[in-house]
Amino acid sequence: MEKKTVTVKILGKTREYPMGITYAEIVKEYEGATKYPIVLVMKDGKLRELHKRLKQDGTLEFITTADEIGHKTYKRSAILLLLKALYNVAGHDKIKKAVIHYAVSSGYYVTVDGDVAITEDFLLKVKEYMLELVEKKIPVMKRSVGTDEAISLFHKHKMYDKENLFRYRRVSRVNIYSIEEFEDYFYGFMVHHTGYIKYFDLYPYDDGFVLQLPERKDPEIVPAFEPHQKIFQIGRAHV
């Protein structure tokens, strides 16, 4: 007889769930049980995104934005959200490429190559659109595609730098993440939906701007941007 339930140990207690339930559904039951939002789970020592399904008995641990891998997941997801908003506000045809260069302060230095003026007004529109997406709790979708399909995908979206990158990469599969119609390649985990990405700010800086994010020690507070010019110049020299 086919097994219809799965038994797992969570926070020291044994629970039983229907076979194939998503981790997101389980996590919903534990809202408020952790100080910070649960963005991933650890199933028997292996990290899993929340859209994945529980299929075997075992032990389940929660990963929040205060954990190292959870914090990295939050930052990576914030970058995807930012890129979606950038292309939407500026218009796809106006951007040749948007580049996340390196960490500066507690965020990332970003430049945009194209017919786009990075002004405070423009960044305000981008931020407002990002907050709209957060409010809607749009699913962050993941799919694995072959390299040839990824090349065609980036060509269609006019992301020619990434198209060229994958022409010379010897990998068989590529993880593509999307928010609505916007798609991009990322290596690493993402949050389940845009509603998790509540904390960020945008600051115009030098030839681009900074996506300012919380630090791991306080994952729901966005610190004020305090540029360290020496560190910035060292980072810029490697761009």
Could you say what each language-model-derived stretch is?
Residues 52-55, 59-73, 85, 94-105, ...:
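Auxiliary tRNA-acceptor-end handling modules of aminoacyl-tRNA synthetases
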